[in-house]
Structure formats: structure tokens, C-alpha cells
Amino acid sequence: MESPLVLALDTDDLEQALAWSRAAGKAAGMVKAGLELVGAAGPAAVAALAGDGRRVMLDLKLHDIPATVAGGMRAAARAGAELVTVHALGGPAMLEAAVQAAGDRCRVAAVTILTSAGPEDLAAVGLPPAAEAVPRLAALAVRSGCRAIVCSPLEVAALRAQLGPEVELICPGVRPAGWGGSPPGGNDQARVATPAAAMVAGATRIVVGRPITRSDDVGAAARAVRDEALAAGPPGGGEDPANHPKPADAHGRFDAL
């Protein structure tokens, strides 16, 4: 069974990102490139990771008019991204445009509510609590054609019951048991859980970055997270993450590791 771990490559240094990816090896089923890396290295970051045999989640959280988001999706697919995030708050027309532009080249993952958002943050922008907003946004995204949802591990059990086994549920805000680290200025994740708890609740994939990339041994830390997740049981709905289609030109560099 493929690892459910998505390794977050939170750096502006492409060589560092590649080094982390290679150190994690097969312990990470995918890697995530976000604004920090792509802002510094551009689409070449995705192309380099995909060319290294990696399945790439491009975490741009697109939220714009439908035509602009569609153009962004086409560019992401050309670069080699397999999953691309958009904000479900963009609404049905934007989500449908993203799905249509992605076609069969990549998948659209709709972000519900950021894991950094607490009740006060949501109230400040006029949104209901996450327990109410997340199921509504997830249902909207699925109706619009999205087959992957990004949500906090605290909401994944309710979404798994609501959406069934076919929808891929991807959980950031995952912290290994006992990890006490935080970024400068404090912890920026408000709704978190352990890898085991996220998997038991029904997650398909878990996104983990700093607890692995800040460790002294990236490979060992990645394997520990993967093992903790898989020991809790199979990914949500009992489906192997590898069953989701890979890009046609993936090189499979890590299959032999």
C-alpha cells in the first residue's frame, strides 16, 4: 500500500526541497509544493519534482474569477502537478471551471476552511463555525465536480460519513504525537490531530511538513509518520492512495526504494 504521507516542502530553495524529497523516499507517497517554493522557483519547481519521479500536490489555493483559475489549472497540469488546490469559497462557477480545465491531466482539491482559522477568525469574516461551514463547502465542491477535499483532521470523520469512500480527503494540520515544535511566533495551526487520529477518522492522505523537515533525520522522521499513520488502519474508505491516477509521464524513481 502506498504511503498516505504528503511531505510539505515548505522552503524557497528548490535544491533543499529536492533533498528533503529524496531523503523521505518512499515513506512519502506525494510531496506538496506551495507558494513559498513556487514563488521562488516558479513552475520549474513542479517540473523538477515530477521529473524526479514524484507525485506533486501543488498547493496554490486558487481563488479568482473562473477564467483565471482555469488558466492556472492548465498551467499547473503542464508543469506536472497531479493535485492542485483551489478555495471552495470561490463558488460553483469557479470550481466547475477548474475541474473542466484540469480534465484528466490533474485533479482539483478543494480547500474548505484553513486549518489555521479558529472560531474568531471565521466570525470576523462573516463565516459560521467550521463544523457548519466545512460540510457545506465540501458538498458544494463535490457537486461542482471536485473529487478531492482538503480539510482539518477534526472535520474528516463527518465528511467521510457525508461524502462516502470515493472522495479523497486530504488533511493538513497533522502533528505526530509528542511533537512540540512551532514556527517563529507560535503555532499557526489551530485545528490539528495526530497521524493516527486523522487516519482513524477517515483521511486518505495526511500533510506533514515541519515535524519531518526540521528533524535531524528527514528519512527516519518520514518513516515514523508513515508507520504511525498506517498502523492506525488503511486510508479512508479502505482505499489505497495509489489507486488514484498518476500523471502519465511519472518516472517512478522511488518505486525501487
What are these regions (language model features)?
Residues 2, 64-148, 152-157, 162-170, ...:
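Conserved anion-binding
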Residues 7, 31, 61, 84, ...:
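Conserved, mostly hydrophobic/aromatic
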Residues 12-23, 67-74, 130-138, 189-197:
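Short, acidic/polar
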Residues 23-24, 49, 76, 98, ...:
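Generic structural signal for hydrophobic
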Residues 26, 52, 79, 144, ...:
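Structural motif
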Residues 83-91, 189-221:
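Glycine-rich phosphate-binding active-site loops on the catalytic face of alpha/beta enzymes
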Residues 95-99, 212-236, 254:
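C-terminal helical cap(s) of enzyme catalytic domains, especially alpha/beta-barrels
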Residues 242-252:
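Short, low-complexity, charge-dense intrinsically disordered segments
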